[in-house]
Amino acid sequence: MKIGVVSLGCAKNLVDSEILLGKLKGAGVELTPNPEEADVIIVNTCGFIEPAKLESIETILEFAESGKEVIVMGCLVERYKEELEKEIPEVKAYFGTESWNEILNYLGLKEKKEIKRILSTPRSYAYLKIAEGCNRLCSFCAIPKIRGRHRSRKIEEIVDEAKFLADQGVKEICVVSQDTTYYGKDLYKEYKLVELLEGLEKVEGIKWIRLLYLYPTEVHEDLIDYVANSEKVLPYFDVPLQHVSDRVLKDMRRGYDGKFVRNLIENIRKKIENAVFRTTFIVGFPTESEEDFKELKKFVEEGHFHWLGVFTYSPEEGTHAYPLGDPIPREVKEERREELMAIQRGITRKKNEEFLGKEIEVLIDGYEEEFSFVPKGRAYFQAPEVDGVVYVESSRDLKSGDILKVKVTQVADYDLAGRDTEALDLIFSSEE
Protein backbone atom coordinates (compact mmCIF):
# COMPACT_ATOMS: atom_id res chain seq x y z
CA MET A 1 0.00 0.00 0.00
CA LYS A 2 1.44 3.35 -1.11
CA ILE A 3 0.31 6.49 0.71
CA GLY A 4 0.63 10.09 -0.41
CA VAL A 5 0.11 13.12 1.82
CA VAL A 6 -1.01 16.43 0.31
CA SER A 7 -0.49 19.44 2.59
CA LEU A 8 -2.46 22.65 2.07
CA GLY A 9 -2.29 25.98 3.89
CA CYS A 10 0.32 27.43 6.20
CA ALA A 11 3.72 26.32 7.47
CA LYS A 12 2.14 25.13 10.71
CA ASN A 13 -0.03 22.75 8.69
CA LEU A 14 3.06 21.58 6.84
CA VAL A 15 4.69 20.59 10.14
CA ASP A 16 1.59 18.52 10.98
CA SER A 17 1.88 16.78 7.61
CA GLU A 18 5.58 16.08 8.19
CA ILE A 19 4.80 14.54 11.58
CA LEU A 20 2.18 12.31 9.92
CA LEU A 21 4.69 11.27 7.26
CA GLY A 22 7.13 10.31 10.00
CA LYS A 23 4.54 8.18 11.78
CA LEU A 24 3.52 6.46 8.54
CA LYS A 25 7.16 5.74 7.70
CA GLY A 26 7.70 4.46 11.23
CA ALA A 27 4.79 2.07 10.67
CA GLY A 28 6.52 0.65 7.60
CA VAL A 29 4.36 2.35 4.98
CA GLU A 30 5.70 3.05 1.49
CA LEU A 31 5.30 6.77 0.87
CA THR A 32 5.11 8.61 -2.42
CA PRO A 33 5.25 12.35 -3.15
CA ASN A 34 3.20 11.74 -6.30
CA PRO A 35 -0.55 11.35 -5.54
CA GLU A 36 -1.05 9.58 -8.89
CA GLU A 37 1.09 6.70 -7.63
CA ALA A 38 -0.68 6.46 -4.26
CA ASP A 39 -3.29 3.90 -3.27
CA VAL A 40 -4.39 6.14 -0.37
CA ILE A 41 -4.26 9.94 -0.42
CA ILE A 42 -4.40 11.91 2.83
CA VAL A 43 -5.29 15.59 2.36
CA ASN A 44 -4.34 17.94 5.20
CA THR A 45 -6.70 20.88 4.75
CA CYS A 46 -6.79 24.57 5.60
CA GLY A 47 -10.01 26.27 6.69
CA PHE A 48 -8.74 29.71 7.69
CA ILE A 49 -10.29 31.99 5.05
CA GLU A 50 -12.60 31.54 2.06
CA PRO A 51 -9.92 31.05 -0.66
CA ALA A 52 -8.17 28.44 1.51
CA LYS A 53 -11.45 26.61 2.10
CA LEU A 54 -12.21 26.59 -1.63
CA GLU A 55 -8.73 25.24 -2.44
CA SER A 56 -9.20 22.48 0.14
CA ILE A 57 -12.61 21.48 -1.22
CA GLU A 58 -11.40 21.52 -4.84
CA THR A 59 -8.43 19.33 -3.90
CA ILE A 60 -10.64 16.86 -2.02
CA LEU A 61 -13.08 16.62 -4.94
CA GLU A 62 -10.27 16.15 -7.45
CA PHE A 63 -8.85 13.17 -5.58
CA ALA A 64 -12.27 11.75 -4.64
CA GLU A 65 -13.21 11.65 -8.32
CA SER A 66 -10.01 9.76 -9.15
CA GLY A 67 -11.37 6.63 -7.51
CA LYS A 68 -8.55 6.39 -4.99
CA GLU A 69 -9.12 6.01 -1.26
CA VAL A 70 -9.14 9.53 0.19
CA ILE A 71 -8.75 10.53 3.84
CA VAL A 72 -9.19 14.15 4.88
CA MET A 73 -7.76 15.79 8.00
CA GLY A 74 -7.02 19.25 9.37
CA CYS A 75 -8.62 22.62 9.93
CA LEU A 76 -11.47 22.31 7.43
CA VAL A 77 -12.66 19.14 9.16
CA GLU A 78 -12.53 20.84 12.57
CA ARG A 79 -14.95 23.46 11.26
CA TYR A 80 -17.19 21.55 8.87
CA LYS A 81 -16.98 17.82 9.54
CA GLU A 82 -20.74 17.14 9.41
CA GLU A 83 -21.20 19.17 6.23
CA LEU A 84 -18.23 17.48 4.55
CA GLU A 85 -19.45 13.99 5.44
CA LYS A 86 -22.82 14.87 3.94
CA GLU A 87 -21.61 16.68 0.81
CA ILE A 88 -18.55 14.54 -0.06
CA PRO A 89 -19.39 10.99 1.06
CA GLU A 90 -16.78 9.58 -1.35
CA VAL A 91 -14.13 10.43 1.26
CA LYS A 92 -13.46 7.33 3.36
CA ALA A 93 -12.77 9.11 6.66
CA TYR A 94 -12.49 12.58 8.16
CA PHE A 95 -10.12 13.56 10.99
CA GLY A 96 -9.39 16.85 12.77
CA THR A 97 -6.03 18.46 13.50
CA GLU A 98 -3.28 16.51 15.28
CA SER A 99 -5.08 13.22 14.48
CA TRP A 100 -1.97 11.29 13.49
CA ASN A 101 -2.54 8.31 15.79
CA GLU A 102 -6.23 8.08 14.91
CA ILE A 103 -5.30 7.92 11.22
CA LEU A 104 -2.80 5.13 11.88
CA ASN A 105 -5.44 3.20 13.83
CA TYR A 106 -7.96 3.68 11.02
CA LEU A 107 -5.45 2.26 8.53
CA GLY A 108 -4.66 -0.66 10.85
CA LEU A 109 -1.06 0.49 11.31
CA LYS A 110 1.25 0.57 14.32
CA GLU A 111 4.46 2.53 14.72
CA LYS A 112 7.42 0.14 14.76
CA LYS A 113 9.94 2.89 15.33
CA GLU A 114 9.74 6.60 16.12
CA ILE A 115 10.50 8.98 13.27
CA LYS A 116 9.89 12.56 14.42
CA ARG A 117 9.25 14.05 10.99
CA ILE A 118 9.96 13.57 7.32
CA LEU A 119 10.92 16.95 5.95
CA SER A 120 9.27 18.16 2.77
CA THR A 121 11.29 21.39 2.66
CA PRO A 122 14.81 21.64 1.19
CA ARG A 123 17.47 20.57 3.69
CA SER A 124 18.50 24.22 4.06
CA TYR A 125 15.55 25.10 6.29
CA ALA A 126 12.71 23.62 8.31
CA TYR A 127 9.80 24.93 10.33
CA LEU A 128 9.81 24.38 14.08
CA LYS A 129 6.37 24.61 15.70
CA ILE A 130 6.64 25.71 19.33
CA ALA A 131 2.95 25.87 20.26
CA GLU A 132 -0.54 25.07 19.07
CA GLY A 133 -3.72 27.13 19.28
CA CYS A 134 -4.36 30.77 20.13
CA ASN A 135 -5.87 32.71 23.05
CA ARG A 136 -6.52 35.89 21.06
CA LEU A 137 -10.07 36.91 20.26
CA CYS A 138 -9.50 38.92 17.08
CA SER A 139 -12.96 39.57 15.69
CA PHE A 140 -12.18 38.33 12.15
CA CYS A 141 -10.33 35.13 13.03
CA ALA A 142 -11.63 31.58 13.50
CA ILE A 143 -8.28 30.01 14.48
CA PRO A 144 -9.08 29.74 18.23
CA LYS A 145 -12.26 27.82 17.34
CA ILE A 146 -10.34 25.56 14.95
CA ARG A 147 -7.11 24.99 16.86
CA GLY A 148 -8.20 25.63 20.44
CA ARG A 149 -6.45 27.57 23.19
CA HIS A 150 -2.71 28.26 23.17
CA ARG A 151 -0.66 25.21 24.21
CA SER A 152 3.10 25.70 24.48
CA ARG A 153 5.48 22.79 24.08
CA LYS A 154 8.21 22.29 26.69
CA ILE A 155 11.51 24.03 26.01
CA GLU A 156 13.54 20.81 26.21
CA GLU A 157 11.17 19.08 23.76
CA ILE A 158 11.55 21.90 21.23
CA VAL A 159 15.34 22.01 21.61
CA ASP A 160 15.49 18.23 21.08
CA GLU A 161 13.54 18.63 17.85
CA ALA A 162 15.93 21.40 16.75
CA LYS A 163 18.83 18.97 17.33
CA PHE A 164 17.00 16.39 15.23
CA LEU A 165 16.60 18.96 12.45
CA ALA A 166 20.29 19.88 12.67
CA ASP A 167 21.17 16.20 12.33
CA GLN A 168 19.15 16.18 9.08
CA GLY A 169 21.42 18.93 7.75
CA VAL A 170 19.03 21.83 8.38
CA LYS A 171 20.80 25.19 8.68
CA GLU A 172 17.85 27.53 9.30
CA ILE A 173 14.93 26.92 11.62
CA CYS A 174 11.83 29.06 11.18
CA VAL A 175 10.04 29.26 14.52
CA VAL A 176 6.27 29.16 14.02
CA SER A 177 3.01 28.99 15.95
CA GLN A 178 -0.29 30.84 15.82
CA ASP A 179 1.13 33.37 18.32
CA THR A 180 4.88 32.96 18.72
CA THR A 181 5.41 35.78 21.22
CA TYR A 182 2.86 34.25 23.63
CA TYR A 183 5.13 31.23 24.02
CA GLY A 184 5.40 29.90 27.57
CA LYS A 185 2.71 32.07 29.15
CA ASP A 186 0.32 29.13 29.53
CA LEU A 187 2.88 26.47 30.48
CA TYR A 188 5.31 28.45 32.63
CA LYS A 189 3.02 31.35 33.65
CA GLU A 190 5.43 33.84 32.05
CA TYR A 191 6.72 34.64 28.57
CA LYS A 192 9.58 32.29 27.73
CA LEU A 193 10.43 33.00 24.09
CA VAL A 194 13.82 34.52 24.94
CA GLU A 195 14.72 31.55 27.15
CA LEU A 196 13.69 29.21 24.34
CA LEU A 197 15.88 31.12 21.90
CA GLU A 198 18.82 30.79 24.27
CA GLY A 199 18.38 27.02 24.13
CA LEU A 200 17.96 26.94 20.35
CA GLU A 201 21.03 29.10 19.83
CA LYS A 202 23.18 26.41 21.49
CA VAL A 203 22.17 23.75 18.97
CA GLU A 204 25.23 22.90 16.86
CA GLY A 205 24.69 23.00 13.12
CA ILE A 206 21.87 25.55 13.20
CA LYS A 207 23.16 28.80 11.71
CA TRP A 208 20.02 30.92 11.38
CA ILE A 209 16.92 31.21 13.56
CA ARG A 210 13.98 33.11 12.06
CA LEU A 211 10.94 34.17 14.09
CA LEU A 212 7.55 34.19 12.37
CA TYR A 213 4.07 35.27 13.55
CA LEU A 214 5.01 37.77 16.28
CA TYR A 215 1.97 39.42 17.88
CA PRO A 216 2.62 43.20 18.07
CA THR A 217 1.81 43.78 21.76
CA GLU A 218 4.11 40.97 22.89
CA VAL A 219 7.24 42.09 21.04
CA HIS A 220 8.76 43.09 24.37
CA GLU A 221 12.01 44.92 25.08
CA ASP A 222 13.82 41.76 26.20
CA LEU A 223 13.04 40.08 22.87
CA ILE A 224 14.20 43.10 20.85
CA ASP A 225 17.40 43.32 22.91
CA TYR A 226 18.04 39.60 22.48
CA VAL A 227 17.66 39.77 18.70
CA ALA A 228 19.92 42.83 18.61
CA ASN A 229 22.76 40.92 20.28
CA SER A 230 22.17 37.41 18.93
CA GLU A 231 24.57 35.62 16.60
CA LYS A 232 21.90 33.34 15.15
CA VAL A 233 18.47 34.97 15.56
CA LEU A 234 17.94 37.03 12.42
CA PRO A 235 16.83 40.69 12.66
CA TYR A 236 13.70 39.76 10.73
CA PHE A 237 10.40 40.80 12.29
CA ASP A 238 7.29 39.12 10.93
CA VAL A 239 4.60 41.09 12.76
CA PRO A 240 1.04 40.81 11.36
CA LEU A 241 -0.49 44.25 12.00
CA GLN A 242 -3.77 43.82 10.03
CA HIS A 243 -4.49 47.59 9.95
CA VAL A 244 -3.34 50.96 11.24
CA SER A 245 -6.65 52.84 11.65
CA ASP A 246 -7.53 53.14 15.34
CA ARG A 247 -11.21 52.55 14.64
CA VAL A 248 -10.68 49.45 12.52
CA LEU A 249 -8.11 48.02 14.94
CA LYS A 250 -10.62 48.46 17.77
CA ASP A 251 -13.34 46.71 15.76
CA MET A 252 -10.86 43.95 14.95
CA ARG A 253 -10.19 43.59 18.71
CA ARG A 254 -6.44 43.69 18.18
CA GLY A 255 -5.56 45.37 21.48
CA TYR A 256 -3.45 48.24 20.13
CA ASP A 257 -3.78 51.39 18.03
CA GLY A 258 -1.91 53.10 15.22
CA LYS A 259 0.37 55.02 17.58
CA PHE A 260 1.48 51.77 19.20
CA VAL A 261 2.38 50.36 15.77
CA ARG A 262 4.53 53.37 14.89
CA ASN A 263 6.26 53.34 18.27
CA LEU A 264 7.00 49.62 17.97
CA ILE A 265 8.62 50.00 14.55
CA GLU A 266 10.59 53.05 15.69
CA ASN A 267 11.81 51.28 18.83
CA ILE A 268 13.01 48.23 16.91
CA ARG A 269 14.75 50.37 14.28
CA LYS A 270 16.45 52.40 17.02
CA LYS A 271 17.97 49.25 18.50
CA ILE A 272 18.48 47.20 15.32
CA GLU A 273 19.54 49.33 12.37
CA ASN A 274 19.34 46.50 9.83
CA ALA A 275 15.96 45.19 11.06
CA VAL A 276 13.63 43.97 8.33
CA PHE A 277 9.85 44.00 8.68
CA ARG A 278 7.22 41.78 7.10
CA THR A 279 3.54 42.29 7.85
CA THR A 280 0.05 41.49 6.64
CA PHE A 281 -2.97 43.75 6.32
CA ILE A 282 -6.67 43.03 5.84
CA VAL A 283 -8.65 45.32 3.54
CA GLY A 284 -12.42 45.39 3.28
CA PHE A 285 -13.19 44.74 6.94
CA PRO A 286 -16.92 45.53 7.38
CA THR A 287 -16.32 48.83 9.21
CA GLU A 288 -13.40 49.99 7.05
CA SER A 289 -14.34 53.33 5.49
CA GLU A 290 -12.66 55.04 2.56
CA GLU A 291 -10.87 57.28 5.09
CA ASP A 292 -9.63 54.25 7.01
CA PHE A 293 -8.22 52.78 3.82
CA LYS A 294 -6.55 56.08 2.88
CA GLU A 295 -4.87 56.10 6.29
CA LEU A 296 -3.63 52.56 5.72
CA LYS A 297 -2.45 53.44 2.22
CA LYS A 298 -0.52 56.46 3.52
CA PHE A 299 1.10 54.28 6.16
CA VAL A 300 2.23 51.72 3.56
CA GLU A 301 3.62 54.54 1.38
CA GLU A 302 5.91 55.53 4.26
CA GLY A 303 7.99 52.46 3.42
CA HIS A 304 8.32 50.70 6.76
CA PHE A 305 8.14 47.20 5.31
CA HIS A 306 10.42 45.16 3.09
CA TRP A 307 7.67 42.57 2.58
CA LEU A 308 3.92 42.91 2.74
CA GLY A 309 0.94 40.63 2.25
CA VAL A 310 -2.62 41.90 1.82
CA PHE A 311 -5.76 39.82 2.34
CA THR A 312 -9.30 40.77 1.42
CA TYR A 313 -11.72 40.29 4.30
CA SER A 314 -13.95 37.24 4.24
CA PRO A 315 -16.65 36.72 6.91
CA GLU A 316 -16.03 33.58 8.98
CA GLU A 317 -18.83 31.83 10.86
CA GLY A 318 -18.52 31.93 14.61
CA THR A 319 -16.30 35.01 14.76
CA HIS A 320 -17.24 38.27 16.50
CA ALA A 321 -17.22 40.14 13.19
CA TYR A 322 -19.47 37.68 11.38
CA PRO A 323 -22.75 39.45 12.37
CA LEU A 324 -21.39 42.61 10.71
CA GLY A 325 -21.89 40.93 7.35
CA ASP A 326 -19.82 41.68 4.28
CA PRO A 327 -20.99 45.14 3.15
CA ILE A 328 -17.95 46.16 1.10
CA PRO A 329 -18.21 44.88 -2.50
CA ARG A 330 -15.68 42.29 -3.62
CA GLU A 331 -14.47 44.57 -6.43
CA VAL A 332 -13.71 47.37 -3.95
CA LYS A 333 -11.80 45.00 -1.69
CA GLU A 334 -9.77 43.68 -4.62
CA GLU A 335 -9.01 47.22 -5.80
CA ARG A 336 -7.76 48.15 -2.35
CA ARG A 337 -5.60 45.05 -2.17
CA GLU A 338 -4.09 45.63 -5.60
CA GLU A 339 -3.45 49.29 -4.80
CA LEU A 340 -1.49 48.44 -1.66
CA MET A 341 0.46 45.66 -3.38
CA ALA A 342 1.40 47.99 -6.26
CA ILE A 343 2.73 50.56 -3.78
CA GLN A 344 4.64 47.90 -1.87
CA ARG A 345 6.15 46.46 -5.06
CA GLY A 346 7.99 49.72 -5.65
CA ILE A 347 9.07 49.93 -2.01
CA THR A 348 10.42 46.38 -2.03
CA ARG A 349 12.40 47.08 -5.19
CA LYS A 350 13.95 50.21 -3.64
CA LYS A 351 14.91 48.26 -0.54
CA ASN A 352 16.44 45.55 -2.73
CA GLU A 353 18.40 48.20 -4.65
CA GLU A 354 20.10 49.22 -1.40
CA PHE A 355 22.01 45.93 -1.61
CA LEU A 356 23.37 46.56 -5.14
CA GLY A 357 27.15 46.21 -5.14
CA LYS A 358 27.16 44.93 -1.58
CA GLU A 359 28.19 41.52 -0.30
CA ILE A 360 25.50 39.54 1.49
CA GLU A 361 25.40 36.13 3.11
CA VAL A 362 23.13 33.69 1.25
CA LEU A 363 21.77 30.30 2.31
CA ILE A 364 21.31 28.06 -0.73
CA ASP A 365 17.91 26.32 -0.94
CA GLY A 366 18.41 24.54 -4.26
CA TYR A 367 18.15 25.27 -7.97
CA GLU A 368 15.65 27.24 -10.02
CA GLU A 369 13.06 24.82 -11.46
CA GLU A 370 12.98 26.38 -14.93
CA PHE A 371 16.77 26.66 -15.14
CA SER A 372 18.24 23.72 -13.24
CA PHE A 373 21.75 25.13 -13.53
CA VAL A 374 20.93 28.33 -11.56
CA PRO A 375 21.36 28.05 -7.78
CA LYS A 376 19.00 30.08 -5.64
CA GLY A 377 18.90 30.93 -1.97
CA ARG A 378 17.96 33.59 0.51
CA ALA A 379 19.56 36.31 2.61
CA TYR A 380 18.61 37.16 6.19
CA PHE A 381 15.91 39.52 4.94
CA GLN A 382 14.07 36.80 2.98
CA ALA A 383 11.87 34.17 4.63
CA PRO A 384 11.26 30.95 2.69
CA GLU A 385 8.25 30.64 0.38
CA VAL A 386 6.77 34.10 1.05
CA ASP A 387 9.59 36.54 0.21
CA GLY A 388 11.96 36.93 -2.73
CA VAL A 389 15.09 34.89 -3.48
CA VAL A 390 18.71 35.47 -4.50
CA TYR A 391 19.92 33.83 -7.73
CA VAL A 392 23.61 32.99 -7.56
CA GLU A 393 26.20 32.85 -10.33
CA SER A 394 28.89 30.43 -9.21
CA SER A 395 31.55 28.14 -10.66
CA ARG A 396 31.08 25.77 -7.73
CA ASP A 397 28.64 22.90 -7.36
CA LEU A 398 26.43 24.43 -4.68
CA LYS A 399 24.15 22.31 -2.53
CA SER A 400 21.09 23.00 -0.40
CA GLY A 401 22.36 24.18 2.97
CA ASP A 402 25.52 25.89 1.72
CA ILE A 403 26.08 29.39 3.10
CA LEU A 404 28.25 31.74 1.06
CA LYS A 405 29.07 35.37 0.34
CA VAL A 406 27.36 36.83 -2.72
CA LYS A 407 27.96 40.24 -4.31
CA VAL A 408 24.62 41.60 -5.52
CA THR A 409 24.75 42.61 -9.20
CA GLN A 410 21.07 42.83 -10.20
CA VAL A 411 17.71 43.42 -8.55
CA ALA A 412 14.10 42.98 -9.63
CA ASP A 413 10.85 43.85 -7.86
CA TYR A 414 11.20 40.96 -5.42
CA ASP A 415 14.35 38.98 -6.28
CA LEU A 416 18.07 39.67 -6.41
CA ALA A 417 21.00 38.13 -8.29
CA GLY A 418 24.71 38.10 -7.61
CA ARG A 419 28.10 36.42 -7.91
CA ASP A 420 29.64 33.91 -5.56
CA THR A 421 32.61 35.98 -4.35
CA GLU A 422 34.08 33.09 -2.39
CA ALA A 423 34.40 31.07 -5.61
CA LEU A 424 36.25 34.01 -7.20
CA ASP A 425 38.57 34.19 -4.18
CA LEU A 426 39.34 30.48 -4.55
CA ILE A 427 40.13 30.90 -8.27
CA PHE A 428 42.46 33.87 -7.77
CA SER A 429 44.19 32.39 -4.72
CA SER A 430 44.96 29.20 -6.69
CA GLU A 431 46.62 31.28 -9.43
CA GLU A 432 49.01 33.06 -7.05
From Swiss-Prot:
Main localization of the protein described in the UniProt heading: cytoplasm
Annotated binding of [4Fe-4S] cluster 1, by residue: 10, 46, 75
GO biological process, one term: tRNA modification
Domain MTTase N-terminal: 1-112
Keywords: 4Fe-4S, Cytoplasm, Iron, Iron-sulfur, Metal-binding, S-adenosyl-L-methionine, Transferase
Localization per record: Cytoplasm
Residue span(s) of domain Radical SAM core: 120-350
SMART domains: Elp3
GO-annotated molecular function: 4 iron, 4 sulfur cluster binding; aspartic acid methylthiotransferase activity; metal ion binding; protein methylthiotransferase activity
Catalysed reaction equations from the record: L-aspartate(89)-[ribosomal protein uS12]-hydrogen + (sulfur carrier)-SH + AH2 + 2 S-adenosyl-L-methionine = 3-methylsulfanyl-L-aspartate(89)-[ribosomal protein uS12]-hydrogen + (sulfur carrier)-H + 5'-deoxyadenosine + L-methionine + A + S-adenosyl-L-homocysteine + 2 H(+)
Domain TRAM positions: 353-422
Positions with a binding annotation for [4Fe-4S] cluster 2: 134, 138, 141
Enzyme class at the top of the EC tree: transferase
Cofactor note: Binds 2 [4Fe-4S] clusters. One cluster is coordinated with 3 cysteines and an exchangeable S-adenosyl-L-methionine.
HAMAP family reported in the protein's UniProt record: MTTase_RimO
Free-text function comment from the UniProt entry: Catalyzes the methylthiolation of an aspartic acid residue of ribosomal protein uS12.
Protein name: Ribosomal protein uS12 methylthiotransferase RimO
Organism annotation: Aquifex aeolicus (strain VF5)
